[in-house]
């Protein structure tokens, strides 16, 4: 049995469905969804991520607008740019590529995006909806991608023991809310958690999102675990690895996502799904 989950194939299924939906919407309204991407500075990794998002958006018929702003821009000037996008009726969704320079107040920037265009799901209102169990806002894309992968391979999550290693607002916290909604018993661990392997080795589902290359070795998992690796770490120059020691773990668990080719493609697919949803709500 091939237990390595092909995130790219799953993402392509979603993108194919979205492409047909975008065409139907265009036939009906004469317009296409439009995603505005705000990129501050010239962080090489951010540039790669943004190009990838634009490529996949355009491939399925979503228009894109890239605002590439200087690293010297002030918080208030960036907020003014976002306000213009909020008012632009042709823009369906807005994302600000993270990380931002230290000189910019990230919380103010994310709060400046209109919640109805916040397709990354980072606005405090959308965060509040998610953690209140209200289906009325956008949910962070990586956490949606993780849940989709998990449910494809374990449709009934009720009563399952899920451990999330990582407490970020992008993955750990939103995914905990999604898994709780599926009636999982959820534990969040992090870099300061003690005896981590003794906790994760009891879990049915382990999500690694701690940003520590190859940290979780085979002793961290029980044999029938589903392992979702969200980590993206660069080692030895150009090699990309996850937070899980993939080569030594893959034969010892039920399912595992690779890095790259696992959760990354799913994140982009759900970003574009959120963008289409924003367009449908507005139109």
From Swiss-Prot:
Catalytic activity as recorded in UniProt: (6R)-5,10-methylene-5,6,7,8-tetrahydrofolate + NADP(+) = (6R)-5,10-methenyltetrahydrofolate + NADPH; (6R)-5,10-methenyltetrahydrofolate + H2O = (6R)-10-formyltetrahydrofolate + H(+)
GO biological process: L-histidine biosynthetic process; methionine biosynthetic process; purine nucleotide biosynthetic process; tetrahydrofolate interconversion
EC code(s) of this entry: 1.5.1.5, 3.5.4.9
Biochemical pathway: One-carbon metabolism; tetrahydrofolate interconversion
List of residues binding NADP(+): 166-168, 191, 232
CDD domains: NAD_bind_m-THF_DH_Cyclohyd (cd01080)
Keywords: Amino-acid biosynthesis, Histidine biosynthesis, Hydrolase, Methionine biosynthesis, Multifunctional enzyme, NADP, One-carbon metabolism, Oxidoreductase, Purine biosynthesis
Example of a GO MF term: methylenetetrahydrofolate dehydrogenase (NADP+) activity
Residue stretches in coiled coil: none
PANTHER family given in the database record: C-1-TETRAHYDROFOLATE SYNTHASE, CYTOPLASMIC, C-1-TETRAHYDROFOLATE SYNTHASE, CYTOPLASMIC-RELATED
Subunit text: Homodimer.
Function recorded in the entry: Catalyzes the oxidation of 5,10-methylenetetrahydrofolate to 5,10-methenyltetrahydrofolate and then the hydrolysis of 5,10-methenyltetrahydrofolate to 10-formyltetrahydrofolate.
Protein name per Swiss-Prot or TrEMBL: Bifunctional protein FolD
Organism of origin: Rickettsia bellii (strain OSU 85-389)
């Amino acid at each position: 049995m091939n237990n390595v989950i092909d995130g790219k194939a799953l993402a392509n299924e979603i993108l194919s469905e979205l492409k047909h939906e975008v065409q139907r919407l265009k036939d009906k309204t004469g317009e296409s969804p439009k995603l505005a991407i705000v990129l501050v500075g010239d962080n090489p990794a951010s540039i790669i991520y943004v190009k990838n998002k634009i490529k996949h958006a355009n491939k399925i018929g979503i228009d894109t607008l890239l605002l590439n702003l200087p690293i010297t821009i002030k918080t208030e000037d960036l907020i003014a740019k976002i306000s213009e996008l909020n008012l632009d009726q042709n823009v369906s969704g807005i994302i600000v590529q993270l990380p931002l320079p230290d000189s910019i107040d990230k919380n103010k920037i994310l709060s400046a995006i209109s919640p109805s265009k916040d397709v990354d799901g980072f606005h405090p209102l959308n965060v509040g909806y998610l953690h209140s169990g209200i289906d009325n806002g956008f949910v962070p894309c990586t956490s949606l991608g993780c849940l989709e992968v998990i449910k494809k391979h374990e449709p009934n999550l009720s009563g399952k023991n899920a451990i999330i290693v990582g407490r970020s607002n992008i993955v750990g916290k939103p995914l905990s809310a999604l898994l709780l909604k599926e009636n999982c018993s959820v534990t969040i661990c992090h870099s300061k958690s003690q005896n981590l392997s003794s906790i994760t080795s009891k879990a049915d589902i382990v999500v690694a999102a701690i940003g520590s290359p190859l940290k979780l070795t085979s002793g961290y998992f029980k044999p029938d675990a589903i392992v979702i690796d969200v980590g993206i770490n660069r080692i030895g120059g150009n090699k990309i690895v996850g937070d899980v020691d993939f080569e030594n773990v893959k034969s010892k668990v039920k399912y595992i996502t690779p890095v790259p080719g696992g959760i990354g493609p799913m994140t982009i697919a759900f970003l574009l799904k959120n963008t289409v949803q924003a367009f449908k709500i507005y139109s």
